[in-house]
């Protein structure tokens, strides 16, 4: 469960990161494809090379969805309902992949935010991304 302090830290960090959605999202996806090559199977129609328009576009979508989750942090289930349905029923993404992408997002945020991504912010974001992943995986039950 996210505390009031966690929510504050997440919102402050997101405010700094949100202007870089396309870059950070693309970098997180590329990290995931490199570290976990099995995740590429969900993107057979994508040009998976660094800087491709498809990677940048999807990265921006992923981080925009995360921004929506930050904005609706007190009602993640409602905010993520459409994405949960899409990933569970249409795309049939294995829920473990949400955790893999979450790890890559953490690395990107830490790499670019430096001191602003303190251990406290990291811990809060870890809880937040776990909550988002749990909501996205909720339709699989």
Swiss-Prot record:
Keyword Nuclease among UniProt keywords: no
Keywords: Heme, Iron, Metal-binding, Oxygen transport, Transport
GO BP annotation list: hydrogen peroxide catabolic process
Tissue note: Red blood cells.
Amino-acid biosynthesis in keyword set: no
Residues binding heme b: 58, 87
GO terms for MF: haptoglobin binding; heme binding; iron ion binding; organic acid binding; oxygen binding; oxygen carrier activity; peroxidase activity
One GO cellular component, as annotated: hemoglobin complex
Domain of life: Eukaryota
Classification via InterPro entries: Globin (IPR000971), Globin-like_sf (IPR009050), Globin/Proto (IPR012292), Hemoglobin_a-typ (IPR002338), Hemoglobin_oxygen_transport (IPR050056), Hemoglobin_pi (IPR002339)
Domain Globin: 1-141
Record Pfam families: Globin
Assembly notes: Heterotetramer of two alpha-D chains and two beta chains.
Family: Belongs to the globin family.
Role: Involved in oxygen transport from the lung to the various peripheral tissues.
Name under which the protein is recorded: Hemoglobin subunit alpha-D
The species this protein was found in: Coturnix japonica (Japanese quail)
Protein encoded by which gene: HBAD
């Amino acid at each position: 469960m996210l505390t009031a302090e966690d929510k504050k830290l997440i919102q402050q960090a997101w405010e700094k990161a949100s202007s870089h959605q396309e870059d950070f999202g693309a970098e997180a996806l590329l990290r995931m494809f490199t570290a976990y090559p099995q995740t590429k199977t969900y993107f057979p129609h994508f040009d998976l090379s660094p800087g491709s328009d498809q990677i940048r576009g999807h990265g921006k979508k992923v981080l925009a969805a995360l921004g929506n989750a930050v904005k609706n942090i007190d009602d993640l289930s409602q905010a993520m309902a459409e994405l949960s349905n899409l990933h569970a029923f249409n795309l049939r993404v294995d829920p473990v992949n949400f955790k893999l992408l979450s790890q890559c997002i953490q690395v990107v945020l830490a790499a670019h935010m430096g001191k602003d991504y303190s251990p406290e912010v990291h811990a809060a974001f870890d809880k937040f991304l776990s909550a988002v992943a749990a909501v996205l995986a909720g339709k699989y039950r």
